[in-house]
Amino acid sequence: MSSISRRGLFSLAGKSAALGAVSLPLGSLAGPVNAAEPAPYYRQNKLIHGVAYYPELWPDADIDADIAEMQSLGINVVRMAEFAWSTMEPTQGNFDFSVFKNVMDKMHAAGIQVVLCTPTATPPVWLTHGHPERCHKNDKGEIMSHGARQHASYEHPAVRKACFTIIERMSRELGRHPSVIAWQLDNEMKAHVSEDYSDAAIANWHKWLKKRFKHIDALNKAWGTHIWSQYYTAFEQVPASVTTPFLHNASLITAYKMFCRESVADFMVAQRDSIRKYSDLPITHNDNPAFNIHHERSMLAQDFASYDAYPTAAQWSALAFRSDLYRAAIPGKPFWLMETSVAHNGWLGNHQPMHPEGFLAAEASLIYALGGEGFCYWLWRQQRTGAELPHSAVKSAWNAPSIGYGEVKKVAAAKDRLEPILLDTTLDAPPIAITYSDHARAMIETEGLDKRSGFPSRYRGVIEMWHKQVLDLGYHREVRFENAELDGLKLLITPAMPYVSDSFLLRAKDFIEQGGVWIAGPVTGTRGKEHTVPTDAGLGLLEKLAGVTTQYVMPLTGTGATGELLGVSSELSGWCAAMTAHEGTQVVGTLTAGRGKGLAFVTERRIGKGKLVLLGAMPHGDNKDGMLNTLIHHYAGEAGISRLADTPSGVVIVPRTNNRGQKIWIVLNMLADKRSVSLPKEAIDVFTGKSLGGTLSLDGYTQHVIQVTGV
């Protein structure tokens, strides 16, 4: 995969704006636009309050009443058409867009804008009926059937051709309608399926390998295929990671995951190019860190990022994590929360607990405060058929206000209250970032390196755990992809990234030399690019930069091992890099009990103006948080970062600056219980103008906007 950077994506957007992207009259069916040009830089200059709307499922007679009710609730955007392929192309080659043209005309007249979606998540039956070769196949050889969604193989040429045909026709027929402000690619790419093992996918796998390695001997050498007689003489012999009596080579398993996920991202780029033939409007995709795609690479297909989230009230921190991730994904652009539930999530066989009163408005306020431009619901009217009957909606299936209807009104009120503040301010640049790596995710899915009880079982859980640790301490932070630039940061935390590439190491070294502090967390550096064990040093190139020698990489889980870091003692668990330090490297954490006693598990080395910190093992047990908090506080201080405030659990402070240079904090209580937070001495309530003194008291699910000085 080629290097993708935040700076590169931002520069591309700036170049588009400078050159002037092609713009055609809305509603025109003139010649195609230049498919090579991205959409122009854009911002709606308002907050979006949106909902998914499915006119193909309900009587036309309901549309006018729906629109009037949307207006009364402050809904200003609808998203549509992502599941309507069979409505627009009921038989192959016969197109009818009248349902959507009619609705879009009415929406435009009412001042409600539209996000138009490509319908490729739910292909019509004519595409796959009688053609099992066009369907997704899992690792057990089971072929997915028409009847749900994501059943087709995007690797099959006939499927791709049909997808691009409907997208191009949609773009030509609907893409310049005056109601449309943006496009969404597909819907929740690979939410229900993972690797594709169809014949078409495996044929493309062999092409991918050939492009990557050029010659089969290079693959054999990189993967060490003489083990268990896995040696190959042609790329066509290399199997996909289908079910075997035991396990495939780790190199093969991880490579197949990367192939499939990169291929999906490239399919998204191809969708974008189909849209661009007739529309230059911004493009997004409703992503989620759980989905089986290459998230960073997929951003090349998008002009702004968006995501879906269905947290319960107890899972509110997931909203902060995803906002911090997708805000940084395409720098300089807004992000949207494209789907969330008004009261509870649900599908056949399960439903989540219902939101407490007030939580939805708190959720929306958090998204808007953290830089989100859009906050949207799934869905307007409860499904009367299908697989998601229990899911909440703004209106019930019998067209009455739902249990969440009043909460939507509260969101509209919160939006109207915050909108003038947010449009007059910009989010302050976070000084701390946590690294998210798609490659690391694939490797850890192949080889779960920490099996202790209570530790996150998924890679995203590890990253979210670190994010929450920083969030709960009251630091302003974000999450950056592996290939992102490190500009503007003072502290970088990279947990659980087994392979550290040359390019990442060079960027990190430059970041440190300029004064940054890099904390490389447990497992980082313990594997090579092709998911092999380094043979030159325990942590590969990272070890040389850190000025250490790794004596052992060993599992501490269940051994009772302990360590001391900066005066704090804790049990340790998971995999540990036990090290000795070279001259110029300081030991700051030592194993105090168990195997490897006396060796270092945390070191720091000054490089230029900054420091590289190696954290070789994770604290565990009762004093886990004490050790991690000490580590973060200490190195944040070394990097010149101060906490915004001593925030109790559940309170989030979002620092922003208005157009006059004044510091504005949005303080949110994401819990139902009352909370209080200490403030700078000079703090004024923006809405009342009153001085707040040294303490701010927050009722459950409330937000305060304050102006502060001296911070």
Annotated model-derived regions:
Residues 144-304, 318-319, 325:
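Polysaccharide-binding and catalytic clefts of secreted carbohydrate-active enzymes
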Residues 67-68, 80-138, 271-276:
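Aromatic-lined substrate-binding rim segments of carbohydrate-active enzymes
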Residues 235-238, 311-711:
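Carbohydrate-binding surfaces of carbohydrate-active enzymes
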Residues 58-70, 288-296, 356-364:
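Short, acidic/polar
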Residues 45-47, 74-76, 110-114, 176-181, ...:
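Short, well-ordered coil/turn segments that N-cap beta-strands
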Residues 36-77:
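N-terminal carbohydrate-binding accessory modules
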Residues 2, 8-30:
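N-terminal export signals
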Residues 49-57, 84-98, 145-162, 251-264, ...:
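The substrate-binding groove and active-site-proximal loops of carbohydrate-active enzymes
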